[in-house]
Amino acid sequence: MAFKDNAVELEERVVAINRVTKVVKGGRRLRFAALVVVGDRNGRVGFGTGKAQEVPEAIRKAVEAAKKNMIEVPMVGTTIPHEVRSEFGGARVLLKPAVEGAGVAAGGAVRAVVELAGVADITSKSLGSNTPINIVRATVEGLKQLKRAEEVASLRGVSVSDLA
């Protein structure tokens, strides 16, 4: 779900920069891979990766990729509507709503994604692999699974007040 309007100011955060090498006949070719998360702190977030000979160019490519890969995050006040578990590769992420004022209880890559999405109160736990790219992908996958109460009610064919 790509958003075309660039009128909204997006904040970007570099999650990881890796030095990668390719072994060729003449020796090693060095490049940099960057993982960047962008968001408007208002329910929209995306991530991207970029690779280049220089770090700034890799970051620029990653930001462009992230802007093309934005998702909408449903929120209830300052937190998420319900608990969600997701995994990508060996990384597993558990995201739980928290009471207002609790803050973001999340580590590293998960923190970057949820803060830039605009979630102010959340508890999370990363299990399994701690590879930043897989943690970010698992977190975004979890945020994609979130549904508002109205959506759940319409899927079940009941009113929102009947959900308990």
From Swiss-Prot:
GO biological process: translation
Free-text note on domains in this protein's UniProt record: The N-terminal domain interacts with the head of the 30S subunit; the C-terminal domain interacts with the body and contacts protein S4. The interaction surface between S4 and S5 is involved in control of translational fidelity.
Keywords attached to this entry: Ribonucleoprotein, Ribosomal protein, RNA-binding, rRNA-binding
Designated name of the protein: Small ribosomal subunit protein uS5
Keyword rRNA-binding: yes
Gene encoding the protein: rpsE
Family: Belongs to the universal ribosomal protein uS5 family.
InterPro entries: Ribosomal_Su5_D2-typ_SF, Ribosomal_uS5, Ribosomal_uS5_bac-type, Ribosomal_uS5_C, Ribosomal_uS5_N, Ribosomal_uS5_N_CS, Ribsml_uS5_D2-typ_fold_subgr
